[in-house]
Swiss-Prot record:
UniProt-recorded name of the protein: WD repeat, SAM and U-box domain-containing protein 1
Organism of provenance: Mus musculus
Pfam families listed in its UniProt record: SAM_2 (PF07647), U-box (PF04564), WD40 (PF00400)
SUPFAM superfamilies according to UniProt: RING/U-box, SAM/Pointed domain, WD40 repeat-like
UniProt entry tagged with the keyword ATP-binding: no
WD repeat extents: 10-47, 52-91, 95-134, 137-176, 178-227, 236-275, 278-317
Gene (UniProt): Wdsub1
Amino acid sequence: MVRLIHTLADHGDDVSCCAFSAALLATCSLDKTIRLYSLSDFAELPYSPLKFHTYAVHCCCFSPSGHVLASCSTDGTTVLWSSHSGHTLTVLEQPGGSPVRVCCFSPDSAYLASGAADGSIALWNAQTYKLYRCGSVKDSSLVACAFSPDGGLFVTGSSGGDLTVWDDRMRCLHSEKAHDLGITCCSFSSQPLSGGEGLQSYQLASCGQDCEIKLWAVTITRVLGFELKYKSTLSGHCAPVLACAFSHDGKMLASGSVDKSVIIHGIGPQSVLHTLTQHTRYVTTCAFAPNTLLLATGSMDKTVNIWQFDLETPCQGSMNDPLKHFTEEWSEEDVSVWLRAQGLEDLVGIFRANNIDGKELLHLTKESLAGDLKIESLGLRSKVLRSIEELRAKMDSLSSGIPDEFICPITRELMKDPVIASDGYSYEREAMESWIHKKKRTSPMTNLALPSLVLTPNRTLKMAINRWLETHEK
């Protein structure tokens, strides 16, 4: 189910962090650099490595749109880069100038949080690059940070072992002693926990120097307010756990440890699914890709390993039309794995009984889903069609040569006036306004309720599209 498909060995010192966008992988290191790779063939981009920091780089992360990359360093700065060109967009200096240990974007790309060794946490406006709010924890370094999927709050973890929950106005909502010897990482699952009416509940994982991974339920209620509740502990590591990350469907949690191993935990009936032992020194970071089951793990052995869980064999050689090649040649089993990845496990039996392979999948319509496959649930049919449309959209954009991130997910056309919705995705303004005016208050991409109907102009993406158009005009 999981296999090593590629190893990156370009850094000259410990790998400290890795992060995915839909099309790229970013890695950073104590060697002061950030490197960018294409997910199509894992080739390093022409403008990589990115160089600005004067000391070790501790963390890197993409904005939800994938157009901006943030990196932070011992030099006391957080740098924002264009992921399309490698150009520096701005340099944010941490209040007090302390080494910055962690950074993360809010789901709507509106804010960037940066946490430092002096315990300060800065919340920046990611559009204007101005400091919005600042807070701090006492007697500890901030080493971990994660926003809730709805963007309503974020959690920080400290070297003292405390999980602290903040709202978007930097008010401290709660502080919990989570790991006796210090926290090293925390991560939210993108999938909400089931709850009653009026409840918003999300799963949070934290790990630490106590060799443990703990799962928490973070719940926001209209009546009782906020609650952080301990759920369970995942075991398996025999040394401090340095990193943890949920898969995009929330069904797996990866963890990396001083014991040099990576463990893939199942969520639900908790179990160890896989133990990966390829690294020869401490595993410092792990990250899942947002839309495919790829996992990257980084280590003090200066390497980043790429692991694949399902579907296609990586294309070797030319990648002119990889998605179309892979999808059309999917076997029936590949389609079954894809269904599970989309959260459509209940349809696996129906698809297998009707021998749906990749080619048949691409030709399914609402009529065939209802008439031929006898899928009675309108919600299930709609979710299948949306997922298939995403595959077709990516194929269309690849075949036309237009970068996928420039294509509106609703119209499947090149965006002219891109805006960021509250689900973190970018859309053509007119298409998204029409979507909302039809009283569709759910995300076109995730089908989850939109936390807000506010649309924020994506100026960075618009500039990138205009530059691309200029270079492709004949």
